[in-house]
């Protein structure tokens, strides 16, 4: 009464602002979503605040360079661009060998900002594209969670994915890679498809197809979608959940999505010819059979006759399908699975057959510690969420269960795919957290009712039982309060962990290195940019640079020089040739470099600073990749009793190969640690075995301040006498 009197005493304009319960809920929901949206964006800005606005890693530099070209020259020139500065002397057809979604998105955002009279450099747009789409992903996660469960689960899912380290790892500011927009497209496609299945709406189905098209344009991970959707449809068919809604949703999404995806030059006819896409086509035809059988069953209206017809139809379908698959494979129309696809099904395949795939760190199997590092408490909420989903089975919960289980399997096979599993883990964990909190709060709000006096023996016993329940209610409520406080504590620890991981682990650009000094202060190593600046200012504009493929994109984008190989890795033989040169004696390597018109050689060395991701640690992969094409290169020649060494006990070929000489040239004169002999390698923890290195065919051109990047000039051939 007092509250009502106080409200009535307010002025009329303020009294009109009183909201109904539903309006209050809507206001709180919108406010929470807005805060989550801002949080998702801001938490990814650590690298910009700590360093500066810059592009991270290796691949993003190619994406930035192509976006700059697109912004300056237009889409037509970009789509038909032949890049002479990469893969010399082969070059690269850029438009037909990339997924353009990321570049087009950033270019459109840049044009939009310019149209709004905001003078922003294209680099700043590229740096902030991933955080912007990560914030948008929280909105999709909310809508998806609400579609699967309820609005509470949607809000929790949005909050969890906003700070989930498994997603933040590839969406921080400066991480201008395909995954920055692809995870948004992935989740959007799944949400629209589930919405289409739930409603049977053609509009939602077509929207799902356009979401799939955006995913195809952005990242090769679209293969996960085009295989998960048919698997989901197949499960629904097997479990007797076929419906007209499912028929409309899948057929519309598949047909329109296929036609749109084929417009991407890098995909083209692979969508109807590649073995990786055949499952989707097979389920499409299977759905037509189901629709036909459903129609025949309605016409016949005779169970016995329909069973006979069903038996004949299934026999014909299986026979025709098997023949079509066999003939298509034998004739070469259906291409086999790619090496990356095989490596997902068999984790040992790449190591045994395609070492260049196995050499990439993000293609390695995932350690258990990585799951805990990237998911924290979600790793324990995930099984609980699966339990709640199975408890309330529907078409939507079946989909999220399948998405969660399949993505977690692939995340275990390849560490990079934790990124794909992150949205599923957040959604399923949100269901567990939301349902648990809702049950606990319902119990806490329950009011005890004293049993009424009733006549009769049976009524008396019921009242006694009810009284016993009411007497235990306070204890249950106390337990519920304790559990609720525990849940909020764990979620708060999750938030703290995510913030710490984002700040310390995922916000360090690999092009600028940082370490702690002896006094605890931060020491910055800016050697990469120093080396690329030197290349740009001190070498001829047509100079050809040979390095391991990891640094190709950065050299081209920042050094503005032609490279022999880069991160595209489309030509294994060309990369193997570079690996052979690095693994050979100097005179043999010189002949290879002359055949490739190499002017400078760039190597990365961490023996002075303790930087472990240097070329000496990558060298065995150069040997394996080179030996895979050129049998003259044999890995055992560089090992001693199966052990990789760089000290006095190292193999003779190791001590005299080009890579060893370029990394350790003049290093034997240098004292790196107090109390250690000259030539002490701080990464390997040993004194090098060959200190008296002489170069005959190359000469040192430049070494950065901390010796991390070393550049050598290839001497011109001597005149014939």
From Swiss-Prot:
Recorded catalytic activity of this chain's protein: a di-trans,poly-cis-dolichyl diphosphooligosaccharide + L-asparaginyl-[protein] = N(4)-(oligosaccharide-(1->4)-N-acetyl-beta-D-glucosaminyl-(1->4)-N-acetyl-beta-D-glucosaminyl)-L-asparaginyl-[protein] + a di-trans,poly-cis-dolichyl diphosphate + H(+)
Enzyme class: transferase
Signal peptide: none
Residue ranges annotated as motif DXD motif 2: 177-179
Sites marked Interacts with target acceptor peptide in protein substrate: 59, 362, 618
Stored Gene3D superfamilies: 3.40.50.12610
Free-text function comment from the UniProt entry: Catalytic subunit of the oligosaccharyl transferase (OST) complex that catalyzes the initial transfer of a defined glycan (Glc(3)Man(9)GlcNAc(2) in eukaryotes) from the lipid carrier dolichol-pyrophosphate to an asparagine residue within an Asn-X-Ser/Thr consensus motif in nascent polypeptide chains, the first step in protein N-glycosylation. N-glycosylation occurs cotranslationally and the complex associates with the Sec61 complex at the channel-forming translocon complex that mediates protein translocation across the endoplasmic reticulum (ER).
The protein's name: Dolichyl-diphosphooligosaccharide--protein glycosyltransferase subunit STT3B
């Amino acid at each position: 009464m007092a509250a009502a009197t106080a409200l009535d005493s307010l002025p009329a304009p303020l009294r009109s602002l009183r909201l109904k319960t539903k309006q209050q809920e809507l206001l709180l929901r919108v406010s929470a979503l807005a805060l989550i949206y801002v949080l998702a964006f801001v938490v990814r800005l650590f690298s910009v605040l700590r360093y500066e606005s810059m592009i991270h890693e290796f691949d993003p530099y190619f994406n930035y360079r192509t976006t700059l070209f697109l912004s300056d020259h237009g889409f037509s020139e970009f789509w038909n661009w032949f890049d002479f500065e990469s893969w010399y002397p082969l070059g690269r057809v850029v438009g037909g060998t990339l997924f353009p979604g990321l570049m087009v998105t950033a270019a459109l955002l840049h044009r939009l900002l310019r149209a709004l009279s905001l003078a922003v450099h294209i680099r700043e747009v590229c740096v902030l594209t991933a955080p912007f789409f990560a914030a948008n992903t929280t909105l999709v996660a909310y809508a998806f969670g609400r579609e699967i469960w309820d609005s509470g689960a949607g809000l929790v899912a949005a909050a969890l994915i906003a700070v989930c380290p498994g997603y933040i790892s590839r969406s921080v500011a400066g991480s201008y890679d395909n995954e920055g927009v692809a995870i948004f497209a992935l989740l959007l496609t799944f949400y629209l498809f589930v919405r289409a299945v739930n409603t049977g709406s053609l509009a939602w189905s077509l929207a799902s197809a356009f979401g799939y098209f955006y995913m195809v344009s952005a990242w090769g991970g679209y293969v996960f979608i085009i295989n998960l959707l048919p698997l989901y449809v197949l499960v629904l068919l097997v479990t007797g959940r076929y419906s007209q809604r499912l028929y409309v949703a899948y057929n519309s999404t598949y047909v329109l999505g296929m036609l749109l995806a084929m417009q991407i030059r890098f995909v083209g006819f692979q969508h109807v010819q590649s073995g990786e896409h055949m499952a989707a086509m097979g389920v499409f035809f299977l759905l037509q059979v189901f629709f036909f059988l459903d129609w025949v069953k309605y016409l016949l209206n005779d169970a016995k006759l329909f069973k006979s017809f069903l038996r004949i139809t299934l026999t014909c379908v299986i026979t025709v399908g098997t023949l079509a698959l066999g003939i298509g494979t034998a004739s070469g129309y259906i291409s086999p699975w790619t090496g990356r696809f095989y490596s997902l099904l068999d984790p040992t395949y790449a190591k045994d057959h395609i070492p260049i795939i196995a050499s990439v760190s993000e293609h390695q199997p995932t350690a258990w510690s990585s799951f805990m590092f990237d998911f924290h408490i979600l790793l324990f909420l995930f099984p609980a969420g699966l339990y709640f989903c199975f408890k309330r089975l529907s078409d939507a919960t079946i989909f999220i269960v399948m998405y969660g289980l399949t993505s977690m399997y692939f995340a275990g096979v390849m560490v990079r795919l934790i990124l794909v599993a992150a949205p599923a883990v957040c959604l399923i964990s949100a269901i567990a957290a939301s349902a648990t909190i809702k049950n606990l709060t319902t119990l806490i709000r329950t009011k005890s009712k004293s049993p009424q006096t009733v006549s009769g023996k049976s009524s008396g016993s019921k009242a006694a039982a009810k009284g016993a329940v009411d007497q235990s209610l306070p204890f249950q409520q106390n337990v519920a309060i304790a559990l609720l406080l525990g849940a909020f504590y764990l979620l708060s620890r999750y938030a703290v962990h995510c913030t710490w991981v984002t700040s310390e682990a995922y916000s360090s650009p690999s092009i600028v290195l940082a370490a702690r000094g002896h006094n605890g202060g931060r020491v910055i190593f800016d050697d990469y940019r120093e080396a690329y600046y030197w290349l740009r200012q001190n070498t001829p504009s047509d100079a050809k640079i040979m390095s391991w493929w990891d640094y190709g994109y950065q050299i081209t984008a920042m050094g503005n020089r032609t490279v022999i190989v880069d991160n595209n890795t489309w030509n294994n033989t060309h990369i193997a040739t570079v690996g052979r040169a690095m693994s050979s004696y100097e005179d043999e390597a010189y002949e290879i470099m002359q055949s490739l018109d190499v002017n400078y050689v760039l190597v990365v060395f961490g023996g002075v600073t303790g930087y472990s991701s240097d070329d000496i640690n990558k060298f065995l992969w150069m040997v394996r990749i080179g030996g895979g094409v050129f049998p003259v290169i044999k890995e055992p020649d560089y090992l001693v009793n199966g052990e990789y060494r760089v000290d006095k006990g190292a193999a003779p070929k190791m001590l005299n190969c080009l890579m060893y000489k370029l990394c350790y040239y003049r290093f034997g004169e240098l004292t790196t640690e107090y109390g250690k002999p000259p030539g002490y390698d701080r990464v390997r923890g040993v004194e090098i075995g060959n200190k008296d290195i002489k170069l005959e065919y190359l000469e040192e051109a430049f070494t950065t301040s901390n010796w991390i990047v070393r550049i050598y000039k290839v001497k011109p051939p001597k005149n014939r006498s």
